[in-house]
UniProtKB/Swiss-Prot annotation:
UniProt catalytic activity: NADH + O2 + H(+) = H2O2 + NAD(+); NADPH + O2 + H(+) = H2O2 + NADP(+)
Glycosylation sites: 94, 342, 354, 534
EC number: 1.11.1.-, 1.6.3.1
Tissue: Specifically expressed in thyroid.
Pathway: Hormone biosynthesis; thyroid hormone biosynthesis
Family: In the N-terminal section; belongs to the peroxidase family.
Transmembrane segments: 597-617, 1047-1067, 1083-1103, 1139-1159, 1191-1211, 1229-1249, 1251-1271
GO molecular function, one term: heme binding
Stretches of the chain found on the membrane's Extracellular side: 22-596, 1068-1082, 1160-1190, 1250
Residues reported in the UniProt entry to bind Ca(2+) 1: 828, 830, 832, 834, 839
Protein name according to UniProt: Dual oxidase 1
Membrane-topology annotation of the record: Multi-pass membrane protein
Amino acid sequence: MGFRLALAWTLLVGPWMPMGARNSISWEVQRFDGWYNNLMEHKWGSKGSRLQRLVPASYADGVYQPLGEPHLPNPRDLSNTAMRGPAGQASLRNRTVLGVFFGYHVLSDLVSIEKPGCPAEFLNIHIPPGDPVFDPHKSGDVVLPFQRSRWDPNTGQSPSNPRDLTNEVTGWLDGSAIYGSSHSWSDELRSFSGGQLASGPDPAFPRQAQDPLFMWTPPDPATGQRGPQGLYAFGAEQGNREPFLQALGLLWFRYHNLCAQKLAREHPLWGDEELFQHARKRVIATYQSITMYEWLPSFLRKMPQEYTGYRPFLDPSISPEFLAASEQFFSTMVPPGVYMRNASCHFQGVINRNSSVSRALRVCNSYWSREHPNLQRAEDVDALLLGMASQIAEREDHMVVEDVQDFWPGPLKFSRTDHLASCLQRGRDLGLPSYTKARARLGLPPVTRWQDINPALSRSDGIVLEATAALYNQDLSRLELLPGGLLESYGDPGPLFSTIVLDQFVRLRDGDRYWFENTKNGLFSEKEIAEIRNTSLRDVLVAVTNMTPGALQPNVFFWHAGDPCPQPRQLSTKDLPACAPLIMRDYFKGSGFGFGVTIGTLCCFPLVSLLSAWIVAQLRRRNFKRLQVQNRQSIMCEKLVGGMKALEWQGRKEPCRPVLVHLQSGQIHVMDGRLSVLRTIQLRPPQQVNLILSSNHGRRTLLLKIPKEYDLVLMFDLEEERQVMVENLQSALKESGLSFQEWELREQELMRAAVTREQRSHLLETFFRHLFSQVLDIDQADAGALPLDSSQKVREALTCELSRAEFAESLGLKPQDMFVESMFSLADKDGNGYLSFREFLDILVVFMKGSPEEKSRLMFRMYDFDGNGLISKDEFIRMLRSFIEISNNCLSKAQLTEVVESMFREAGFQDKQELTWEDFHFMLRDHDSELRFTQLCVKGVEVPEVIKDLCRRASYISQEKLCPSPRVSAHCPRSNVDVEVELTPWKLQCPTDTDPPQEIRRRFGKKVTSFQPLLFTEAHREKFQRSRRHQTVQQFKRFVENYRRHIGCLAVFYTIAGGLFLERAYYYAFAAHHMGITDTTRVGIILSRGTAASISFMFSYILLTMCRNLITFLRETFLNRYVPFDAAVDFHRLIASTAIILTVLHSAGHVVNVYLFSISPLSVLSCLFPGLFHDNGSEFPQKYYWWFFQTVPGLTGVMLLLILAIMYVFASHHFRRCSFRGFWLTHHLYILLYMLLIIHGSFALIQLPRFHIFFLVPALIYVGDKLVSLSRKKVEISVVKAELLPSGVTHLQFQRPQGFEYKSGQWVRIACLALGTTEYHPFTLTSAPHEDTLSLHIRAAGPWTTRLREIYSPPTDDNCAKYPKLYLDGPFGEGHQEWHKFEVSVLVGGGIGVTPFASILKDLVFKSSVSCQVFCKKIYFIWVTRTQRQFEWLADIIREVEENDHRDLVSVHIYITQLAEKFDLRTTMLYICERHFQKVLNRSLFTGLRSITHFGRPPFEPFFNSLQEVHPQVRKIGVFSCGPPGMTKNVEKACQLINRQDRTHFSHHYENF
């Protein structure tokens, strides 16, 4: 086997060696890591192998938990009791100090367990209160930290496999303290020139320690000096611990180079590798010989048995008992100081740190010293070696000097520690057996009494044994191996220690096939072996120091009488300077301020982003003003005369809007940027006007208080501009004959004194409720309470009167409508141009409670325009035109004339040109007046054709389904009737001659003999509950009902996110003990890791909410029933908001982590981050700024926080409205965001990267969706028509691109060029697929749609610029195309869900009008809305459908729900007037439609039942509902109930909005 390995080595290194080297290296070169020193077990003795016990382990749990208090005494107490003693007692055998430190050097060559284990475990030593060294202030809370050593992870699993520590160096006597324990370490020590080890500037010294050579570099406990400067590169990590150990390392360094130089002279053809290997094997052999045959006998006073050859079955592994015995015994012989002398026996003085001179080097002040002033030259090192050779060590007993006991280099934050107490803890960490068990296991005689441990000690100092026995409760079986072995030692190691040490060295020698005496390994010849055996340490010293042999005694490990250079005296602590005291290190010292500034800076990121956004907003506002000035110069030449620009303050929660104030005679006009009039204020005497000016903040605010109006607050850029406005106002008020008062207030008080439009509307709403409660007998609780505030502002608001414009707006009509003019003029009794509450109340009383005569008289007075008591034909025509205007209908003048002539002729007034009130009342009574009252009927005369056509309805109400009370129904005498019609406010049947199944046959003079099935459409009205609790419960139920899909999806999403958080949090809290990080930062790591998992999930899947093409596709699948794809943007915002909150928590967790990492010692950090830190004993961790700015996760994390702060601030509602371009540009930082996220987690600082697990799939889908969007061309479109409709709806009609095909019900994305070419918003197309243009109805519900409405406001003249163009992208979404597959279809639209049906209705009518083959014969459209005010634009489309529906295909029903809850003026007027005015021309007053407007909820089940009666031949009816989930759920429930019957099947299809 040896031959084969030698051959393999030769083949491996041969090609790279010089020819001479290949010929000279004839042996198998020994590895540096200890492998293959034993061919039986290759790993024995290798670096990293476990320690091999001589005695079974003794742990508390039998596995790994060490024994401790109270079972065993406190280590510090035991150290003080059994091992404290005075210094200055010489060795009984005259052993020298050189032998002591040579023993430490040999021990460093054989074993090293100083590296802490991972995860970090601590066996801290509690210091008894009042300890003179460590607790002089008697605090009682001092703890000396002790970290357990590294162990084999394959051990410590069970009592049969207890924990075993690992050896960090080779377990062979192979010179690893000289050459290192690995090939790479050795390479760092070599110079690769002449076979020598690398030296520094001085050839006598090696080069200094540096990376990647990880020398042990703790701070100097005496001075606090840190770093590798002044420390040399040795094979042993702790070779620089003391100058004395360092001197021995320098000795062997110089000896190797001396051998290499000698070999180079003898063999000039050898190369570097050959010289190095020959010198190395010679040095190792010499080191083995000196250790085994010179030092060991001097240490044990025993010679090992003769070497008999290599024994492959002998396990040479180091035992923990050997480590404890040897190290502990060495410590008893360490003196308090060490002499230095030259070759002429001159013991020189030593320079201390304070420049004083002392007899010797103080040991306690020499630990880890750097650039020692007494060891600057090679001669100084020689002097130290000579001094140690002549100095007698301390006595070999149980006592230890204070330099070792109290002032040993301390770990972690302590500069000092008790070495003996630490050794005791180390023994417990090793699981060492008790003293008695060890003796028994090693075959030594048992000890049964404390005095038998050391009879000599019992006689001379029995108090020590007694005190020790007391600490162990007189139980000898508890006595530990270390104190027991020390107590039995006196002059020589006791029997236990001697047996352990001798056994270990014999096994090391006999189990090593590379031992220099093994003649079979080919290393040395017999002659060379004999030469090596004859080489002593004295020979080495003489060779290296170039001194004469007479300067040293023959055996440098002893000094006997007559030997050269005796020491002056046995050193004691009195002869030496005091030890530097204990220093508590503060790792965070000096970092508090910077750490706080860093955290404050991170917290200021949002503020900086806010400041940036504010600057951008200001720049945008300034540019906007500049553009306004430029535009107005060309557009408003005439208009600017007497006008001034300003900002109107609308309230604290409302944004200021730029306006133009134009003063005219008797009026103040407030206009927007396109000169559309926003408000007109009438100036009529005798009003008292108050003018309030601000006195601070630049004196640029003005408040105009005019009675009967809400206040006008204007803000100017400069005080001068305000002054000009004040002067103009004063002139205008004087011209109008108005008196005014002027005073000043602070701007804040001025704002509080202003009555805003919103405040007035709230006050008037409550007041209106009380008015209607009196008229309609509504419960006062439903009407609401009047404000209790009695301030001047409230009193002024309650005395306000409605202007003509406000009156029209409250009715939802245009101010110029004739109906508004007529009613306003009639109600304005005092003629002051305003309508008081009492005046309006009088009108309401007549409408609601007046008799038919009173109501007809009111109508007569309304339309008696000239007030002469007569209504002419022209005035009658104007009356009809007023109703037509209300209906937004367009009838020609000829048609109106025909209607009037027919009505006059039927009443017998064909010869009259004017009507008195009696004539007017008779005409209405005889013809259509019945339609205005509750109990009237039409008699004897056929309805005129024009009225018949207008009266044709698509809805019928079955009297069988209604309560036939006398108040709501009336029957005329049948003998006088040709056609009987039931006419009530709730049910109406009009004759029609279309649609054969519904035809009613009319015969003059005959009754209706055939029964016609009628459709039940009566609304189901629910009592509105005013109880706050009931409202809250109902609101919650409706919320859950309407958003059940949203709630379900959110529940799933946040359950996953929460599960990820909990999984990571649980893992790091309870399952990551092997990492040890939770012991360092429990809260911080749980918070940061848990949030990191959730953030990874959220930031990944948030991309799916922006995959518009995918969402468009999925909306057309069954998934749309479970996932609200239309809420993707809202979901995007919600995820983003949650993610930013978690990001803040994640950052907070890492702030805690950084702080704790900054105060954690390097030994702990090297366990937590083995790829980032190497424990070199320096203890000091990296500063906080290193974690923040010099690590990849830290730096990317800071950058991510900055990017997120920018993105989130600019994405907020306010700044998105101020500068959408800023939002768009900053939101494109998401690319950099995801790049940094990937980099942030890829460093694997705490755990392996996991972000890609969540990110990969959504990213691929998102990229694919983006590519689809990029492949689709966006078309630029010109706007053909723009119209501002009531309730903030803007109607845009624009060109249809060539090849643009879509289905009714689909939607598009548009971008207005004036608002930015990159901001797209989705809207449903309200045009039909057959139309040449595309149309949208856009409600101003947000900042973008509001600005769109302003941009497309109607121009004031023909010279204004054309409308801005649009970008069109689409179409998207689901087309509701299934309706045409049913002979009868029911379309149910609720809320915004009516939008897709607008296109469908128009499409159906068109196909019918062009005789297109359409299977569908009848469509019932049910429009359910909270108030029709929100969707007046749909009424226009329905009106268009009605007028084009010549085949009576569409039947429309409108249901307005929750009247009492809404209860505003307009809805209340609708409730009062609808039943009276909808009968005029058979149209609704407010919708302008022929359909009846119902108040309540649609009765779906009765409606579907009656539908079966109306269409008995239809076996399958399609029901399509679109709107809130609550409505579609009711439709579904009704369909299911009807489908239980064996009749018509109702197939329900729904889509929720």
